Amino acid sequence: MPVTDPIADYITRIRNAGVAKHKTTDIPHSKLKERLTVLLEEKGYIKSHTVVQGEKFPVIRVHLKYDMYGKPVIKEIKRVSKPGRRSYEGKDIRKYLGGLGLYILSTSKGLLTDKEARSLGVGGEVLFSIL
């Protein structure tokens, strides 16, 4: 069955794996998903990732990160801009929860966090929020 919203599928797979306390989760590969994974890794929300050949197609194997109590580092991850209701922010992007979390934006400069987009003075589509 085809996925109508690949970013929502990506978010759901990461959220479900964290709740189930899995060490890794496999996500169907695409360039966008790989860039999102690299961004989450840079910001410390996941341990690492590798691209491996699945049964038919390549997959991104995401190694999840947990705190010292065994709880997932990703407390909350939500899709903001959806296929039926797109959400855009201008260059004066608001902070997510007063700066505790991040917005991930798709901008003309590539995928950026809200802080990076504010410093570059660009806006874009708010893909999801993460805490």
Curated annotation (Swiss-Prot):
GO terms for cellular component: ribonucleoprotein complex; ribosome. GO terms for molecular function: rRNA binding; structural constituent of ribosome. One of its GO terms (biological process) is translation. Keywords: Ribonucleoprotein, Ribosomal protein, RNA-binding, rRNA-binding. Pfam families: Ribosomal_S8. InterPro entries: Ribosomal_uS8, Ribosomal_uS8_CS, Ribosomal_uS8_sf. Part of the 30S ribosomal subunit. Contacts proteins S5 and S12. PANTHER family: 40S RIBOSOMAL PROTEIN S15A. One of the primary rRNA binding proteins, it binds directly to 16S rRNA central domain where it helps coordinate assembly of the platform of the 30S subunit. Belongs to the universal ribosomal protein uS8 family. This is Small ribosomal subunit protein uS8.
